[in-house]
């Protein structure tokens, strides 16, 4: 099969597609024929630096999510040809991921779906919307009465969070560092779009929940914007600051 294979830190211009053995099935794992996959910031981090970490399998095929069909169900309850999605749980780090024609995946990380969405549209959903859902409901316990701040709203995760929050009935304020992208936030459903200069204190009122996607760079400022008893979920690191 064809696959992207990493063994060391690699620039984007150095990424190459190579021949790699199609994995053999084993008990509890299924072979998925990859039809499409989303690309994530975490894969960029892996390619640039994390590949050097001792916990990363090497060589590794990156890719933390995919959509496709069951090619071989092994001893599981899946059936050949079944449409599935899979994401995270060690994909592209502990075992080979989705940047390939086939992926051997633990059956408990694979989910059957019944949809008429095209493969490329379906591939935009798994990791992004799963992360947004977990951040909003598992971490923030979001309700329709909340005023949600999405800090760094013009990334894929930000768009997903805005859409979910508005579907719930929340008031949503979202930010971007680029004036040219402010209209995208309101088109996505945000009630208010703000140009972010890394200091929102005094510009926003009534924020009860916040999804911090810029990261440590703006986290302290986000905390200063919260109403008493508010909750902040720091899910992203678009700002590139780690300490």
Predicted regions and their residues:
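Glycine-rich NAD(P) Rossmann-fold beta1-alpha1 loop
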Residues: 129-130, 152-159, 215
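Glycine-rich beta-strand-centered segment in the early N-terminal region that forms part
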Residues: 21-38, 50-91
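Glycine-rich phosphate-binding loop and adjacent beta-alpha segment
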Residues: 185, 217-243
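Adenosine-nucleotide cofactor-binding segment
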Residues: 150, 166-221
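NAD(P)H dinucleotide-binding glycine-rich loop of Rossmann-like/cofactor-binding domains
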Residues: 87-152
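N-terminal Rossmann-like NAD(P) cofactor-binding module of classical short-chain dehydrogenase/reductase
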Residues: 85, 208-211, 233
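Short glycine-centered segments of the SAM/dcSAM-binding site in methyltransferase folds
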Residues: 83, 147, 171, 230-231
């Amino acid at each position: 099969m064809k696959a992207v294979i990493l063994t060391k830190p690699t620039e984007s211009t150095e990424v190459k597609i190579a021949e790699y053995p199609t994995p053999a099935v084993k008990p509890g794992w299924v072979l998925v024929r990859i039809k499409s996959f989303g690309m994530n910031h975490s894969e960029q981090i892996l390619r640039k630096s994390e590949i050097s970490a001792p916990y990363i399998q090497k060589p590794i095929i990156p890719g933390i999510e995919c959509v496709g069909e069951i090619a071989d169900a092994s001893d599981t309850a899946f059936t050949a040809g079944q449409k599935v999605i899979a994401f995270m749980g060690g994909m592209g780090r502990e075992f080979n991921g989705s940047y390939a024609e086939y992926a051997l995946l633990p059956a408990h990380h694979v989910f059957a779906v019944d949809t008429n969405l095209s493969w490329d549209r379906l591939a935009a959903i798994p990791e992004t919307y799963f992360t947004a859902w977990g951040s909003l409901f598992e971490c923030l316990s979001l309700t329709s009465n909340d005023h949600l701040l999405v800090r760094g709203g013009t990334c894929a995760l930000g768009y997903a969070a805005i859409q979910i929050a508005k579907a719930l009935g929340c008031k949503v304020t979202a930010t971007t560092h680029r004036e040219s992208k402010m209209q995208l936030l309101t088109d996505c459903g945000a009630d208010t779009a703000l140009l972010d200069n890394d200091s929102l204190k005094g510009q926003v009122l009534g924020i009860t929940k916040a999804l911090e996607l810029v990261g440590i760079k703006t986290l302290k400022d986000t905390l200063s914007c919260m109403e008493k008893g508010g909750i902040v979920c720091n899910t992203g690191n678009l700002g590139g600051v780690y300490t």
